[in-house]
């Protein structure tokens, strides 16, 4: 089981170079959790770049049986705020997590699961990355 960030589903939706490896990692995980806040963020990004028809295709992807949408509860709320203080935009930390990032981070943190993402922002935090052992991730920085 893994948590999927907005950046990963957007990369899949837009057929970016990471698409095939991200799809493979999701399939290998059997279950891919995604914060409902991250889903809204993904819809916003896709709509902004490609319009509503692309959002319909994104929603079709997220309806596949391996995806489970998880609304934030109190634990995720607290973890998202803690992540904002430690890693959020304006905190001075190089990760500079945005609002949507905080909820993917929080879901992964609360569930103790690795996060599938694109980019370098999360790799500058303490969250485990899908396919990378946490110790290796930290030492490669």
Q: What residue spans do the PLM features occupy?
A:
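Acidic, PIN/NYN-like endoribonuclease modules and their adjacent C-terminal/linker elements
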Residues: 105-141
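Short, well-structured N-terminal submotif of metal-dependent ribonuclease cores
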Residues: 1-34, 47-60
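A general structural signal for well-ordered alpha-helical segments in protein cores
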Residues: 19, 39, 55, 77-81
């Amino acid at each position: 089981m893994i948590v999927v960030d907005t950046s990963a589903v957007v990369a899949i939706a837009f057929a970016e170079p990471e698409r095939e490896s991200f799809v493979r990692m999701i399939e290998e995980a059997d279950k891919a959790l995604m914060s409902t806040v991250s889903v809204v963020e993904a819809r916003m990004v896709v709509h902004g770049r490609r319009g509503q028809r692309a959002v319909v295709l994104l929603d079709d992807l997220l309806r596949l049986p391996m995806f489970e949408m998880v609304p934030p509860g109190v634990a995720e709320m607290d973890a998202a705020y803690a992540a904002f203080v430690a890693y959020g935009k304006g905190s001075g930390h190089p990760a500079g997590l945005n609002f949507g990032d905080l909820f993917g981070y929080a879901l992964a943190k609360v569930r103790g699961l690795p996060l599938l993402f694109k980019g370098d922002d999360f790799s500058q935090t303490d969250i485990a990355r899908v396919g990378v052992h946490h110790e290796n991730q930290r030492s490669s920085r």
